[in-house]
Amino acid sequence: MVAVRWGRKGLRSQRRKYSRIAYKPPSSKVVSHVESVLNKRDVTGAEVKPFADGSRYSMKKVMLIATLTMAPGELVNYLIVKSNSPIANWSSSFSNPSLMVKESVQDTVTIVGGGKLESSGTAGKDVTKSFRKFVKLGSGISQTQHLYLIIYSSDAMKITLETRMYIDV
């Protein structure tokens, strides 16, 4: 089955269906890798974006993998949000430490997912923790919208963020 026909979906009637099968449009995977140092008791964020240029795409789902090196007993809260406009200042948009969306940006920000990560271990040794979050974005995020990972850390720590974006170009 080499013929590709996208555009037609659904039924004409219950007895008479479309004669040709409608296939899904092609999707591709884009992987990115970012390393950063988080400051103590600070709200920071990173934009999840497949391309730096203005090519046309629609993101359908994202897999976020974060690995953190932190001291025992520390806490990391994170939110995954989508926004119609770019977020310039993280601290003015999200509360500290609970990461609640402030009233000034409530109309433009939608929370997609979130969670927390706590470390345990013996004192004096750093602990490496990680989380993997798979986020389905429904109808998708176009190139005019923005997807962010917002992080609050209770202590200074190193983070490695890897993302795999499933996009339709």
UniProtKB/Swiss-Prot annotation:
GO terms for cellular component: T=1 icosahedral viral capsid. It holds the Pfam family Nanovirus_coat. It is found in: Virion. The keyword Chaperone does not apply. Its main location: virion. It comes from the Viruses. Keywords: Capsid protein, T=1 icosahedral capsid protein, Virion. InterPro entries: Nanovirus_coat. Belongs to the nanoviridae capsid protein family. This is Capsid protein. It comes from Subterranean clover stunt virus (strain F) (SCSV). The gene is DNA-S.
